[in-house]
Amino acid sequence: MAGRSGDSDEELLKAVRYIKILYQSNPYPKPEGTRQARRNRRRRWRARQRQIHEISERILTTYLGRPTEPVLFQLPPLERLTINCSEDCGQGSERGVGSPQISVESHAALGSGIKE
């Protein structure tokens, strides 16, 4: 796949095949039996799905050499976030609705977040 250095496409495809086999080995349970029996089968199926998911993550980490989850985006402190609607209220179609406005000054209306 484009953009990766040191990884061959064959290894990645092999990893994907292994993961596909794992998921295919755990089909959804059949809707037969009493309510309690169906519930127990679904509970066991979900537990197996969680295990398969964890094993799949380990396989991908091994083949790709990096975690599968993206790096978390750092947000500014809540004290610096404000809603600024003085310029263009009501014209949300022109600009992105809810675009963040960051103000340096602190507003007393927000408070410090500490209960007295």
From Swiss-Prot:
Motif (Nuclear export signal and binding to XPO1): 73-84
Gene3D superfamilies, sorted: 6.10.140.630
Modification sites for Phosphoserine: S5, S8, S99
A GO cellular component entry from the record: host cell cytoplasm
Region (Disordered), start-end ranges: 26-48, 90-116
This protein's UniProt keywords: AIDS, Host cytoplasm, Host nucleus, Host-virus interaction, Methylation, mRNA transport, Phosphoprotein, RNA-binding, Transport
Domain of life: Viruses
The record's account of how the chain is modified after translation: Asymmetrically arginine dimethylated at one site by host PRMT6. Methylation impairs the RNA-binding activity and export of viral RNA from the nucleus to the cytoplasm.
Cell compartments where the protein resides: Host nucleus, Host nucleolus; Host cytoplasm
Residue ranges, compositional bias (Basic residues): 36-48
Any one GO molecular function term: RNA binding
Other remarks in the entry: HIV-1 lineages are divided in three main groups, M (for Major), O (for Outlier), and N (for New, or Non-M, Non-O). The vast majority of strains found worldwide belong to the group M. Group O seems to be endemic to and largely confined to Cameroon and neighboring countries in West Central Africa, where these viruses represent a small minority of HIV-1 strains. The group N is represented by a limited number of isolates from Cameroonian persons. The group M is further subdivided in 9 clades or subtypes (A to D, F to H, J and K).
Protein name: Protein Rev
Organism the protein comes from: Human immunodeficiency virus type 1 group M subtype F2 (isolate MP255) (HIV-1)
Gene designation: rev
